[in-house]
Swiss-Prot record:
Source organism per UniProt: Aspergillus niger
Keyword list, A-Z: Activator, DNA-binding, Metal-binding, Nucleus, Transcription, Transcription regulation, Zinc
Free-text disruption phenotype from the record: Reduces growth on birchwod xylan, while growth is unaffected on D-xylose, xylitol and other carbon sources like D-glucose, L-arabinose or L-arabitol.
InterPro entries hit by this protein: Transcription_factor_dom_fun (IPR007219), XlnR/Xlr1 (IPR051439), Zn2-C6_fun-type_DNA-bd_sf (IPR036864), Zn2Cys6_DnaBD (IPR001138)
Start-end of Basic and acidic residues biased regions: 73-84, 565-581
Location of the region described as Disordered in the Swiss-Prot/TrEMBL record: 1-32, 53-118, 172-210, 559-601
GO cellular component terms attached to this protein's record: nucleus
Transmembrane regions: none
Chief localization: nucleus
Protein name: Xylanolytic transcriptional activator xlnR
Amino acid sequence: MSTPSIPQFTSSFSPFSSGSHSTGMAPSQTVGLDTLAEGSQYVLEQLQLSRDAAGTGAGDGATSTSLRNSMSHTKDQPPFDNEKNQSTGSGFRDALQRDPLVEARSAVRKTSSSAPVRRRISRACDQCNQLRTKCDGQHPCAHCIEFGLTCEYARERKKRGKASKKDLAAAAAAATQGSNGHSGQANASLMGERTSEDSRPGQDVNGTYDSAFESHHLSSQPSHMQHASTAGISGLHESQTAPSHSQSSLGTTIDAMHLNHFNTMNDSGRPAMSISDLRSLPPSVLPPQGLSSGYNASAFALVNPQEPGSPANQFRLGSSAENPTAPFLGLSPPGQSPGWLPLPSPSPANFPSFSLHPFSSTLRYPVLQPVLPHIASIIPQSLACDLLDVYFTSSSSSHLSPLSPYVVGYIFRKQSFLHPTKPRICSPGLLASMLWVAAQTSEAAFLTSPPSARGRVCQKLLELTIGLLRPLVHGPATGEASPNYAANMVINGVALGGFGVSMDQLGAQSSATGAVDDVATYVHLATVVSASEYKAASMRWWTAAWSLARELKLGRELPPNVSHARQDGERDGDGEADKRHPPTLITSLGHGSGSSGINVTEEEREERRRLWWLLYATDRHLALCYNRPLTLLDKECGGLLQPMNDDLWQVGDFAAAAYRQVGPPVECTGHSMYGYFLPLMTILGGIVDLHHAENHPRFGLAFRNSPEWERQVLDVTRQLDTYGRSLKEFEARYTSNLTLGATDNEPVVEGAHLDHTSPSGRSSSTVGSRVSESIVHTRMVVAYGTHIMHVLHILLAGKWDPVNLLEDHDLWISSESFVSAMSHAVGAAEAAAEILEYDPDLSFMPFFFGIYLLQGSFLLLLAADKLQGDASPSVVRACETIVRAHEACVVTLNTEYQRTFRKVMRSALAQVRGRIPEDFGEQQQRRREVLALYRWSGDGSGLAL
């Protein structure tokens, strides 16, 4: 089959094609355009184009006139009258034939009187043009106002048809001149231009916005952009004719450009992102070619790979599968548009603010810059800032208490993240996980309407977090590894490449891929999963966090910094800037003999400590929840300083916390999780060790009957008594002194951190109300600490497994230890009643409190099951309190085991009150079957179903 010539190919698509072509092409070419042809805009536009074509194509005016006359008479003729076509001259055969365009035009004329014709706007805004949305032509347009987009008319006006030979010749000459020895001058000029642009005040994130400079810079930019566009066109033509030569020349030119004009992109209304701001990120998230190489991330990457004129394998940045930097740089993947409607990448003229620092005027929290390109298609920029506020929101104005149930303790300073000019430099994975945690409970309208919005957004943020983290494999990403990477990873006959072990990790120092930010990201993922119904799956994330923390040696203090003599003109206040803006991920280094010369800020040191102690506490807490041995040992952190007071930490007063003890604490020292809950977890670790030693299949019985057992139990009991005394001293210090007005001993506790935790605290509350709230907060902490302390007494003396407790094969209920444990069970119930008084919805520590409420209730269930109507009034009141507490827990943090035990306890309480059902035996058997789901004996996994 021969290929048709160009005139034949063109005439087959002409509105005045010959009869043979029309009959063959009309049915197939107009099927997809039937609905489009019915619209008045389309028909009128095609009518005007056909008239212009007829006027220019005819030889004289008579021909044009006869053509118009013949077309005006065709509305009364049959659509395909072959006899008429044959009798007509061949020169006018196209015009006399009835075609779909004329039919559609006739239909429009018939209905034009009933339907008003909407006036066509001359130009749509950049957003509507890129989104293919109808625009009203206003500035700003209605569409941009409705969706909060930036309405601009900055894109380049393009003309239809081929470029003129004069323009192509000029472009080729410019490209030839640039490739014949002028690359050095181009480098110098471009680098000088970049240096001058970087030093301008409009580009500084800390500086003020200069509108005069902005207008001048934008007005002078189109000419430069036109030159770059011309050079790009010529480079593309040369790449098709001489690939090897053009590739080298283009690579030199683009390297010289250094991403000067395309280092910020604003795709589909998403915020721009500066490449220079990404140089400090860990290598795990950086592009494989580095940020200085502009070959794959240059202006030529904006060419749409689906266009027929673009190269096949070069300059493609739209496909995330072929180039992992596409989502990192904020480009929309081509998969967003269907194959039948290819949307070209936006023209460089769509980005008028290339040289300006991104987000300088719109981003409330610049700390979000690394993650904004990834979340632009998930949540708005304003919502991301609001979610960051939610993450750091405190439920109390007197002392720090995270409002989100999934934020178990503050690892980072709020001021470091929310600083307007010098925020903490964070990995995108950490920021995405923080937004994901906050989105679980945020009441933003974007997440609540429709009801499925929260689940959809949270799922996308979760997938993004895991994708940015690359879990469990801290090695080169896809495309980062060199061709001989696998060969290099065979060391001493062992292949290490598959485990993500890079060469620098085999030395004294760990690479920056295993950073503190990654550990915190694991903690966020594990916390939310632990609070869900998939508790067993959370151990994967906790194990990763514990392993990476141990690898980074977070349980050890870093060596002291090298002292440098302060310059004469250096101010003493520079330390505050260093505290707010620490070096990038320097905390991932610092173990080994070669790290003594690394300077680490005190804030980074405290972040390492708080992260370790949080993992230390959750390790012991989950050992009780899931009936598993400890992972992090006391000897690993024997020389680590205890975490500082949360109020001092948020203020940044490191000098006031200079004198601290080392090692795991056993006394209550503060209102935060680190102050009252961490000491309890230290004691719980000893109880867990005793429990597993007692139940050891070989040595358990001998150890249980040895004097060493009694000594260990006495040691743990002494620690619990020490904690009880410190709890009373803590209550007296923060209630009696505040009541008497003697607040000199703790000057920073009252309102010192209100500047950054509750902005309206000072203006809306009086000193008296803050003192009252501080007293209530202190008593609530004491109530929680008292309850958990009683539960630890029960765990030390009693049985953990509810089925073994109810069956009582060894007659433990007749022993003295049972009487002691029962008294602690009643005391725990009384503390729970006090907790419900100060915290009715149990929202103070819902993540931790559930298991201690459950373990403290087993003995009361045993008493209700055995004694029934003979139970004492104190036991009945304790059972009622436990039922109310479980109902409150179900409302705050709904989990299956709490709902199940509430039903079991409610059934037992009904029997105590004399309401014994007819199937009493079946009720007892059903309770045991339900409790058998949660076993702490043998190979039982506790709450991890």
